């Protein structure tokens, strides 16, 4: 009865279930039938926000001309269609911007940010091509839109003109920022200029509106900023990657809250709408786009499904009260880039929570901090993982040592356990009782080797999510053929070495007395090795180093505590005279042909077997 092997079998079975679940969900995504969810307009009129210092939030009937409004006076991105494929948005002239971090394309149609390539993040299809975070294509849609709410004011359907006439901008040496100004047609005495400001060494883009009121009336416009995207997952370079895709909102009161696209399909709006702090974002694996309104500024967050499979998430803020002849500027920072945790924590409170560590965040965060510390020291994420593995191993050393000592003792008495099983193979209840009595007599805990494994399982899972979620490990090289620790080993050498290390470990463990368990233990190294073909190389590296350290520790402890006693050594009094196991002792002595001592009489009777009372009763019944 090898309980450690049972635990390993449970872990193996659970891993298979996770793989199956991931595969089924992935297939459902591709086989999902087309569906169109009807959307209702927001309530008519102007509503009052409870957290906006008395400033009104616009309703869907601001003007008669906004009959096509989708939310709070914001025009929808198009008519409803029956297709689940994103449409190609209307376009005008393209304005190209190149900085040290990004290549951006702004469309004069709506002044939308239609494309954003991250120069320091390779594409999963071709690592020589920058990753495209934003894009507007026939098959994929993910753009940043903005505009003003009010009669005749420009929105993301307005055609802008480039004020300077320049179509290509580049952040040159000595410049800290580059500014693009788009001029909207003047209507009803209101002139609006939309601005984009790109900064050096930053993924933050400031999008603003300069509103000049040349009329005689006072105006109270609102500005909206939204992300429009489809529900198509970004391309992944490993089948084991599955992370959250959808919107998220954060406020000081409600904290961090995810908004899955499925909830928007069902019309659920269980998220904080009105606040004067926080942010709203669109998330995908490794990357995000987030609107970051200034603190203590009244705002209304919104997220909903548009037509077909397009979704919006954004924020509405008041642009202020603009009297005749006055010019007001309102600006909204947009972060569009990788989920670099140190950078996110500096931008806005709670923004680092967008890094998805799953349900073991409390363990994963310290692991990543320690991993980052080792990386800052070594400059190599692979070496950092090895050092982290050694640290975790040292942390659990006392538990592991206790478990291995228990296994070493169990290895010594395995032949005796086998004889007990042979004696009671027709009566499982008596066999179990005899084995438990034997464990008690020999002071062996059969579960002693399982506890260290159970304790380390959460650490293993947390490290799995750390490696999957940390964009810092994306395309991070280790050595030789390992050029990306976040993707599987391209040559499968690490999984094979892991399987070999597991096989060596099984040879150090007590031989299972059950033939079925013995067969399973022979298969497990091969099965685990095959499963780890699809795991990130960084996780396989952790498991391999952990196994090597475990083998060294287990071999040393087995050598110290697991040496079999000499054939001439006298039998311990506990195993000889213990009343709990007289029958099994008798069987063991008989099988070893134990003879009476030479000093005693030749015809001296054998010592009677001291059978416990409960066994006498069973014998009489039988």
From Swiss-Prot:
Its main location: membrane. The keyword Zinc does not apply. Pfam families: 60KD_IMP, YidC_periplas. It is a multi-pass membrane protein. Residues 47-87, 563-622 are annotated as: Disordered. Signal peptide: none annotated. One of its GO terms (cellular component) is plasma membrane. The chain crosses the membrane at residues 6-26, 381-401, 451-471, 525-545. Gene3D superfamilies: 2.70.98.90. Residues 62-83, 583-596 have a biased composition (Polar residues). Keywords: Cell inner membrane, Cell membrane, Chaperone, Membrane, Protein transport, Transmembrane, Transmembrane helix, Transport. Residues 613-622 have a biased composition (Basic residues). It is found in: Cell inner membrane. GO terms for molecular function: membrane insertase activity. GO terms for biological process: protein insertion into membrane; protein transport. Belongs to the OXA1/ALB3/YidC family. Type 1 subfamily. PANTHER family: CYTOCHROME C OXIDASE ASSEMBLY PROTEIN COX18, MITOCHONDRIAL, OXA1. NCBIfam families: PRK01318.1-3, PRK01318.1-4, yidC_nterm, yidC_oxa1_cterm. Interacts with the Sec translocase complex via SecD. Specifically interacts with transmembrane segments of nascent integral membrane proteins during membrane integration. Required for the insertion and/or proper folding and/or complex formation of integral membrane proteins into the membrane. Involved in integration of membrane proteins that insert both dependently and independently of the Sec translocase complex, as well as at least some lipoproteins. Aids folding of multispanning membrane proteins. HAMAP family: YidC_type1. This is Membrane protein insertase YidC. The lineage of its organism: Bacteria, Pseudomonadati, Pseudomonadota, Betaproteobacteria, Nitrosomonadales. The gene is yidC.
